[in-house]
Amino acid sequence: MRKILSILLPAALLLTACSGSTESGSDNLDDITVKAGAEGAAPTVDFSAPLELPDSSAEVITEGKGDGATDGQWIRYRLLAKDAVSGEQLGETYSGPVDQTVELSEGFKTADPALYDALLGSNPGSEIAYYVQPPEATSASAPAQNPQLLFLTVQDVRDKPVKADAAEVAELDKAGKLPEITLDKEGVPSVKIPEGKDAPDNLIVKVIEEGDGKQATESSTVKANYAGWNWSEGTEFDSSFSRGEATEFPLDGVIEGWTKGLTGLKEGTKVMLSIPTEMAYVQGQGDAVGDLIFYVELTDVK
């Protein structure tokens, strides 16, 4: 259960309270009440604590609209976590800049069939209550952990992203829906994100300058100068330019967006990558959260 909880919860919300309660509470997810929050704010989720169920279980509280999610699709969601015993709120992601994502995969189905079944068929606007039993203690000295109630709101349902073809990239570029990369006189990049435009659903590879060296394969080791920004706020989270040297890495050992985005490019190529969350850091890595933008100069291919 800890495995699936780590899939759903950002690290900041992987909290476990250990307080107890002797009051009479609820034993039914139907007793949960929800009051919508303001735009960009979490809803108010109430229940009679302690909430006590025999097993982990999930239930759709509110039906959304649109096509229901099918196996293999990705769900983008926001969530709120509460201690099921005390009712204390542990954290929420509604007020954050980006959605969380999870794939309706066989691994997910095996790890938690109850939640998988609740998310299968869900659509944007669906609200799901998920009661999570704590993991078994790993030692006799480990403190007892309380169950949690997670409340999820489905934001979007998406097919697994793919690498966009040249026609799609050209169309998005012509419509002004792609980020613009500018280099200063020292060759250091900055980005301008199109105002009011959402990140593309698919992986975008926009070649700025084509090289004429060796072509990269999925198993190549490459050296590159690069910078990365979050689509949501345009915040730079990493840059080899600030470190003053290119970085070497194997293409089969990086995020999927880099592997698929750089494979086939030639040494010397300069490129902009727009990478959807599902092909980047699904649960975030430091400040690299959500959909990402990279500028990459491929300086060496081995």
Where are these regions (language model features)?
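Cross-family detector of peptidyl-prolyl cis-trans isomerase
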Residues: 2-302
